[in-house]
């Protein structure tokens, strides 16, 4: 996420290139305004981009409905990351970031 000085798609040593939607960028901007722990978020994104499994505390799981094919993990109890790992093209796609009510209502 080059604008935020932490990640560049296809950075050296990462298994997956990081891509993100315009909505994710807006969600991240809002999270910064809300003083969310973005260091924790970037650590999770880095693990995902490296192909590492997330610890159980992140409650990583598959989604259904509108987000079928995607996964969700908890950065904080009510702060979620919706993403997809596209193994065929080696891409980590970041779709949304927000609370349960922001994402699913």
Where are each of the predicted segments found?
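Basic, Lys/Arg-enriched alpha-helical interface segments
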Residues: 1-77, 86-92, 97, 101-105
């Amino acid at each position: 996420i080059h604008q935020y000085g932490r990640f560049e798609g296809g950075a050296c040593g990462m298994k997956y290139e990081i891509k993100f939607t315009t909505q994710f960028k807006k969600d991240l901007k809002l999270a910064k305004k809300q003083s969310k722990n973005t260091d924790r978020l970037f650590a999770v994104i880095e693990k995902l981009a490296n192909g590492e499994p997330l610890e159980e505390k992140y409650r990583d799981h598959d989604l259904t409905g509108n987000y079928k094919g995607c996964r969700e993990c908890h950065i904080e109890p009510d702060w979620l990351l919706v993403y997809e790992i596209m193994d065929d093209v080696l891409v980590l796609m970041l779709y949304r970031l927000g609370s349960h009510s922001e994402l699913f209502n």
